[in-house]
């Protein structure tokens, strides 16, 4: 069962696990684990998507319980009236508090987008980011005897495909576990030494005006076990108090960590 973060007569929000598709497409119509169908079966109602999260990303996913609710939510997302906050663990020490305004060329899928225009101009893409913590671990990566990581808070101001992943890669601080835009040696090292085998990007919080009641609404999603183990091993527990979970302990994974 999926964790229900919020539900009322109009909306439902869940904590999407990493690795789950939001909905099926013709490319993955045989996929058995899909958020929309799982939520529908779980609450006994059809749900309507208003935004999406990449398959490897975890966190808050908000849906409507009617087509009208889905439409109103989608409009708020399109007009950037919903504030989104993410957290990521990245390569290196990213300590800035800044805004990156870096247009992105549309990222096309070779199969799904084979009929799309190839001459599209880069689209505006803006991300606010803030470094929260850094650490240097005594594990080698490539030719370096130690490995540096950073904990970063992100607020996308636009909604381009893979925007956060591509923007952080542009800053030379790719997200750990990003197989497409990241550092494969860093990914292998994080998997080997810290049991970190997922994209370390989490949609932590949505802040919006309820599209039916007009009241302020804040929805937050807790971190999964992998995130909690890494925060513990890096000495970062307590830095994300709204998202950390007390039920996950590091004992089982700490025994597997081999620092040199």
UniProtKB/Swiss-Prot annotation:
<dbReference type="GO" id="GO:0003723">
    <property type="term" value="F:RNA binding"/>
</dbReference>
<dbReference type="GO" id="GO:0160149">
    <property type="term" value="F:tRNA pseudouridine(65) synthase activity"/>
</dbReference>
<dbReference type="GO" id="GO:0000455">
    <property type="term" value="P:enzyme-directed rRNA pseudouridine synthesis"/>
</dbReference>
<keyword id="KW-0413">Isomerase</keyword>
<comment type="function">
    <text>Responsible for synthesis of pseudouridine from uracil-65 in transfer RNAs.</text>
</comment>
<keyword id="KW-0819">tRNA processing</keyword>
<comment type="similarity">
    <text>Belongs to the pseudouridine synthase RluA family.</text>
</comment>
<dbReference type="Pfam" id="PF00849">
    <property type="entry name" value="PseudoU_synth_2"/>
</dbReference>
<dbReference type="InterPro" id="IPR006145">
    <property type="entry name" value="PsdUridine_synth_RsuA/RluA"/>
</dbReference>
<dbReference type="InterPro" id="IPR020103">
    <property type="entry name" value="PsdUridine_synth_cat_dom_sf"/>
</dbReference>
<dbReference type="GO" id="GO:0008033">
    <property type="term" value="P:tRNA processing"/>
</dbReference>
<dbReference type="InterPro" id="IPR050188">
    <property type="entry name" value="RluA_PseudoU_synthase"/>
</dbReference>
<dbReference type="InterPro" id="IPR006224">
    <property type="entry name" value="PsdUridine_synth_RluA-like_CS"/>
</dbReference>
<feature type="active site">
    <location>
        <position position="54"/>
    </location>
</feature>
<protein>
    <recommendedName>
        <fullName>tRNA pseudouridine synthase C</fullName>
        <ecNumber>5.4.99.26</ecNumber>
    </recommendedName>
</protein>
